A protein has these predicted regions:
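Short coil turns linking two alpha-helices in DNA-binding domains
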Residues: 79, 104-108, 122
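DNA-recognition alpha helix
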Residues: 80-96
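Polybasic low-complexity intrinsically disordered regions
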Residues: 114-286, 291-299, 311
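Basic, short loop/linker segments at the boundary and entry of helix-turn-helix/winged-helix-like folds
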Residues: 28-75
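Charged, often Cys/His-bearing segments associated with DNA-binding zinc-finger transcription factors
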Residues: 1-46, 388
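An anionic, glycine-rich sequence signature occurring as long contiguous blocks
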Residues: 2-4, 300, 307-309, 317-417
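Major-groove recognition helix of helix-turn-helix-like DNA-binding domains
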Residues: 97-116
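Residues within the helices of the helix-turn-helix
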Residues: 81, 85, 106, 280
Length: 417
């Protein structure tokens, strides 16, 4: 019978390890050395800021720090201290980074804090450099611009499930004294607005769960390559005061910064940094289903197409059944100037001008020609009304929906003439 086991000797182990050390080829590092020319990628302003006169010579080069961070992301090590331990036991990685001696973790942290803005400019420069490469890979997909928001969860105690369980116990204690208090809904109001150790980590509802995170916008192309990341921090809110925060006691409706509210400021900053970039197709979710956003995408950011699903909440349709006595309103036609006509005798509707409520798109309001002012409202005097409303039939026209027919001014009106 064949022996399935073999005797392992210390000599064989030593021989195998020695052979592996002598024969291994770090091909990945060789590829990086061959194709990664950091001197041509790092902006000149970054060099000047790093090597400016400080009273003593730099022990570590700028390229060494950049290589350290790139290698850290390639390997997938989150903590700087763990990455330094890895370098301490691997000569090849130290040689790749160019460290004659290893810096401590505090030195790495100070570098990121002191040169945060320059690191951002470095990545912005990479976007400009990689854009032609993306176009060469797939011209069609590289011409897509995809926008979405996310939350970067911070490793704070408030994100630990134990923290929530403690607050839930407090809520249940309140429920014992007040039976009308719902502990599972009320616990949300007991949670602090920000994390104790990091005020940038705010309590918000993201991706179906609550957490303490820094909300951010991510812009990618159709290839999935990131083009821009914008944190919704205090600096961003100060630059764009139109971004309003909201905080409620209900996690189902709480939104720190809405997706549609953040779209215009983020895209404005993106194209300001990259004025030579242009895209024809915008892709986003149904939260961008707004006529104001369609107008901004087309005329401010010069998109030719906007792929945004219709939001059912923005499309109110009157539902009837066979047993309902309510009839479906007759369709309304329009004249050559875009004025709606009465479905019974083609009489032009009466224009009441522009109508724009809070957080609503600009629209033109038309009312039934037989609707008369009566006190605080209007009263329909039609003998055969086409609606059950005592106000009379109303038609709203969104100019951005058909910019050719409604170019900001109603055709055929006194203002047009």
């Amino acid at each position: 019978m064949r022996n399935k086991f073999s005797q392992i000797s210390l000599f064989d182990i030593y021989s195998d390890v020695s052979s592996a050390i002598n024969n291994r080829e770090p091909s990945f590092l060789d590829l990086l050395d061959e194709h990664l020319d950091l001197s041509s990628l790092i902006p000149v302003e970054f060099y000047r800021a790093f090597y400016k006169y400080t009273g003593r010579k730099r022990v570590y080069s700028l390229e060494s720090f950049i290589r350290f961070f790139l290698l850290q992301k390639f390997i997938g090590i989150d903590k700087d201290s763990a990455m330094l331990i890895t370098l301490s036991v691997c000569q090849e990685l130290r040689d790749f980074c160019g460290f004659t001696k290893l810096p401590d973790a505090a030195k790495i942290t100070r570098f990121k804090q002191d040169f945060c803005d320059h690191l951002e400019n470095f990545f912005n420069r990479l976007v400009d450099i990689t854009e032609p490469i993306c176009r060469a890979l797939d011209e069609k997909k590289a011409d897509y611009l995809i926008f979405d928001t996310t939350g970067l969860e911070i490793p704070v105690a408030e994100n630990n499930p134990k923290f929530f369980n403690i607050k839930l116990k407090h809520a249940k204690a309140i429920h014992k004294k007040n039976p009308n208090f719902d502990p599972y809904l009320g616990v949300y109001s007991l949670l602090p607005d920000t994390a104790e150790k990091c005020d940038r980590a705010k309590h918000q509802y993201i991706n179906g769960h609550y957490c303490y995170a820094v909300k951010a916008a991510v812009v990618t192309n159709g290839l999935g390559i990131v083009r821009h990341i914008q944190l919704f921090d205090d600096e961003f809110k100060k630059t764009h005061p139109e971004v309003v925060e909201a905080k409620s006691d209900n996690p189902d409706v709480d939104k720190e910064i809405g997706d549609s509210t953040a779209l215009k400021p983020v895209l404005s900053d993106f194209f300001k940094v990259h004025p030579e970039l242009s895209y024809k197709t915008f892709i986003g979710d149904s939260s961008f289903d707004s006529f104001d956003i369609y107008s901004a995408l087309r005329y401010d950011f010069h998109f030719e197409r906007a792929c945004v699903p219709i939001n059912p909440r923005n499309s109110k349709q009157k539902q009837t059944d066979e047993n309902s006595a309510q009839q479906k309103p007759l369709p309304v036609n329009f004249d050559k100037n875009g004025i709606p006509l009465c479905p019974l005798d083609n009489t032009p509707f009466i224009s009441l001008g522009k109508s724009k409520g809070a957080h609503r798109s600009t629209r033109f309001k038309f009312v039934c020609p037989k609707s008369k002012p009566g006190g605080k409202s209007r009263i329909c005097t039609c003998e055969t009304p086409c609606t059950d409303s005592s106000y009379g039939r109303c038609v709203y026209i969104y100019p951005d929906k058909d910019f050719r027919m409604y170019p900001g001014i109603l055709r055929g009106t006194e203002h047009w003439d």
